[in-house]
Amino acid sequence: MKMKKNILLLCALCLFCGACKDDESYADQKKKERKAIAAFLARDPLVLLDPNGDTILNIPKINPISQQKFEAQDSMTDVSKNEFVLFGQTGIYMQIVRKGVGEKLKHGDAKRIICRYHEYSILGDSLCTTDRTDYWATSPEILDVSNNWGTITASFYGGSNPGAMTVVYGSTTNSTAVPKGWIVPLSYVNIGRQNDEEGIALVRLIVPHSEGTAAATSNVAPFFYEISYQEMRD
């Protein structure tokens, strides 16, 4: 188990080491990031397959929309048109695939949320980390989340069996901080337990370095995420 986790860690570190050159200024790196995100938005549909030929990710060509249009659509994105709303202040793009069962977080709520995710490196053009595998089946990401008058905060709950995100990035930064990009959807989706009629919340995100992990921030690296959110049982 330790070896497999170390291999995953090394893969992430190698990816970041190739993300920028020592002689690049921060301004150059941000320009490179903007170009990479623009190219990702304009690219042809992206399909990632696992070694068995099963689809990991299928991302049709993205159709960005404004916050104004997003709000006019009851804070939803049209998945049939592959709409992603751009939050201009942060540069985050978000698609709500499913709003999910349950209710939105209210003031005073404090919940433990289970997340499953894929993380795709936009600069590296490859899958970086994921916990949607048999190996991580019993180790999802667990978030301790609270809402204080509309301000939502979250931290990773590592426990004795931490998930892939915590193992990779917590090990390199000694931090339980949740990327700000992961928290944004919690203002729009419902949090509950899956039932026979409704699925749990599912979103897709493009997260620039300033809203990502500490490693993404230090390397000026943008990432694409697909994340599900489910309330944990008491």
Language-model-derived ranges and their functions:
Residues C20-D234:
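Cross-family detector of peptidyl-prolyl cis-trans isomerase
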Residues M1-C20:
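Sec-dependent bacterial lipoprotein signal peptides
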